[in-house]
Amino acid sequence: MNYLKKLFGSKNQENIPMEQERHSQEEIEKAFNKSMDKLNNFKRIAYIPTTESNQASFSGKSKIGGLPYLRNDNDWPICPNCKKNMQLFVQLNLTELPTNKENGLAQLFYCTNSEPHCESDMEAFFPFSKSVECRIIETNSESAQIEPNINELFEEKLITGWTPKDDFPHFEEYDQLGIEFELEDDVYELMEEREIGLPIEQDKLFGWPYWVQSVEYPFDRKTETQMQLLFQLASEDNLPYMFGDAGIGHLTQSPDNREELGFGWACY
């Protein structure tokens, strides 16, 4: 990364006088401001969920983990590999979102069974795996209630509120977005310190994906349109699950078809 060097030249690291060090900090600040001027054109609002532990119940409330809303006794998705019910990872009541309100529930189910190891057997880290169920359903009555065939149900955390926060694209997306600058290390550290200019790593609604490896948007299987982030799940944030080695998962949605959902994750 040579963004600062191009702008301001190389720095002598030996015996830097105080005045020169002050100028160096000024140069970093100028580079930071110049970077933010460009990145602000791509700023989105993400929403951080406020959660509280809840006794698991079949309901149509927004939640992470726990028990889902079921339309009937056969509505809980079953993994084709182990024949057990999949864990509910997240359920969003779309009428209660802070923005882009719609009817229905968005649900993400994921098989966490380790014997057999369905995650690897079914390549659940890739979108559209058979051991993952992403769907939008309507709620027309009270939820059905069943005893799931699942090893250990995850704790239910109700989403009780949303905190808006500025969110910015990952540097891996700069080329695709036409952002023409190289993110200098000193500027990146300043962004981290001020918590601005970077994608949020934690659980969030909307915003920009935090890519652990590279840009991995799925595409609508009919229209081939790039899908958009609906919800991001970080390892062991609200969900008691680790995606590989501290990975991050993304529930995405097609802009062409709201029922086209996908989920994938990557780790370090």
Q: Model-derived features: where do they sit?
A:
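Preference for intrinsically disordered or flexible, low-complexity segments
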Residues: 3-268
